[in-house]
């Protein structure tokens, strides 16, 4: 029963990710789209942050942590009702339903293919940094496993702050320039991270990487939709499948770490992903 419930939660979460982004394109356009997608990432991060507190409230006040499930169900029903009451005029350029083949056929478009790989690598960077941060503190600073978790916490916190700041900046500045500047700073921080062994210097660099990479997922997503706006639904579904990068990059990191013998192997893999993202920021042009 629990496995079925978790499967349904995963399916529902994926459906939301696929459907909400093209729905948003009917409300906002251009650079504001990237800003709005980033705002969605902020809300998602804040919601994730609140989850443990809701569980604690259910356990201490209501007497059982399992009461968080009815609370989540109620919040979901409220959100669904709210969305149903909001009138959104949806564009319907095509009446036919796209097949799997037609959706993945979009990868024949060079721009869509490059941006799809961008999603794969940016998710890989996100999961990779979250994974390697505690290991760096253990390897270079002598932290124990429990204390090393501060690395992931710092990354997550500054990723949320960066997405919040990006929400406002992307409504005022060019998305391509914002993308370019942030990924350049992230690459610089990553290169410096190879040589740092102090606790605070490592945490500062991890924070900087989290801050600068926070809006890149949304920027790539909006670039893909702007490249083929008439295929927004198909592109949204296609891009969401790119999150499998979070399952592909960490094993590569592990292999390189074993090969080299230090976490520098993991950093090399992440740096290569960032270099590809730099190419996306300067080599891919989409319509405004």
Question: What is each PLM-predicted segment?
Answer:
Residues 91-115:
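Juxtamembrane intracellular "pre-TM" segments in multi-pass secondary transporters
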